[in-house]
Regions:
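Secondary-structure boundary elements
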Residues: 73-158, 166-168, 235-237, 248-266
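Hydrophobic/aromatic-rich core segments of domains that either
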Residues: 130, 162-250
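Intrinsically disordered, low-complexity acidic/polar segments
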Residues: 11, 61-65, 213, 225, ...
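Intrinsically disordered, low-complexity N-terminal segments that are enriched in acidic
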Residues: 1-79
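Short beta-strand segments enriched in hydrophobic/aromatic residues
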Residues: 58, 208, 262-264
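Generic structural "secondary-structure junction" signal
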Residues: 4-6, 21-23, 36, 43-45, ...
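Glycine-rich, flexible loop/turn motifs
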Residues: 26, 30, 64, 75, ...
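A structural signal for short, well-ordered beta-strand segments
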Residues: 54-56, 204, 258-260
Length: 267
């Protein structure tokens, strides 16, 4: 499965997109349950190398990330949603499967942000976002796909995927729907973002009352704007991973190399 075509919606306009694979395949394109554009490949012939190349031109609309006034009120935590809202939001409200003791400690950690921000929803979420950026060390190779949100909390280090998983967990424990976003980030000379510029990037989208989904990037301590290009979203990394697949026959040692380049096209 390939999730390499950027999202197309009211905030992100895909002007052109091309996805090529260097070996013969049978392919089928479809939209998954999260609205991601997916290409399913079937490869029958052996190969020693496969190159997957995705090129897209995307217009990301510039909007004020803090232009939502209704949130400047105190809230009761965890947030309570109407039954018809929960039908849609439930997949993004379930905390990860962790021991009760670990979830309890993470819930206490999440509530500490609520208390020091006097139950203001937006200030609480901004505080969590910036605290992860400020107090957690970005260290490649320090974690793997099995690293839990609690492990990241205890060890205070990781990469964008780990910081995203931690913020998703904390938000859900506060009753805030949270989803995993995989995409790209522009880190050119005019951009203030400095981490994760040469590979795919991960961040969080939180569903805010009377506002909708808003992007938070705890790796860089910012809200997402025109420097972030969304490619796929889901409940977690597995739902949004750029590539995945299964070898049914044969197989052997394998390596994966990823190269990402994001350029700013002048109008």
């Amino acid at each position: 499965l390939l999730r390499l075509t950027p999202c197309h919606d009211r905030l992100q306009n895909v002007i052109s997109s091309e996805l090529t694979v260097s070996v013969p395949t049978q392919s089928r394109d479809y939209e998954d349950v999260f609205g991601n554009r997916v290409r399913r490949l079937a490869i029958d012939n052996p190969f020693s190398e496969m190159v997957i190349e995705s090129k897209s031109v995307v217009e990301v609309l510039d909007v004020d990330p803090l232009g939502f006034g209704p949130l400047r009120v105190t809230s009761a935590f965890p947030l309570v949603w109407m039954p018809w809202q929960r039908q849609v939001l439930d997949p993004f409200l379930l905390p990860p499967e962790l021991p009760e003791s670990e979830l309890a400690e993470l819930a206490e950690y999440a509530m500490s942000f609520v208390k020091r921000n006097e139950s203001d929803l937006l200030d609480t979420l901004l505080d969590i976002n910036h605290t992860i950026y400020r107090e957690y060390q970005y260290k490649s190779g320090s974690t793997n796909l099995a690293t839990s949100a609690f492990d990241v909390y205890v060890n205070r280090r990781g990469v964008c995927q780990d910081f995203t998983n931690l913020m998703i967990c904390l938000a859900r424990l506060l009753g805030v729907p949270a989803r995993y976003v995989c995409g790209y980030i522009y880190t050119g000379p005019k951009a203030e973002n400095t981490r994760q510029g040469e590979a795919s990037h991960a961040w969080v989208q939180l569903y805010l009352p009377e506002v909708g989904w808003k992007g938070f990037d705890p790796t860089n301590g910012i809200l997402t704007q025109t420097d972030h290009v969304r490619v796929a979203v889901g409940r977690n990394y597995i739902d949004a991973t750029p590539t995945s697949g299964t070898i049914y026959l044969g197989g052997g040692p394998e390596t994966l190399e990823v190269d990402v380049r994001v350029d700013d096209l002048e109008p």
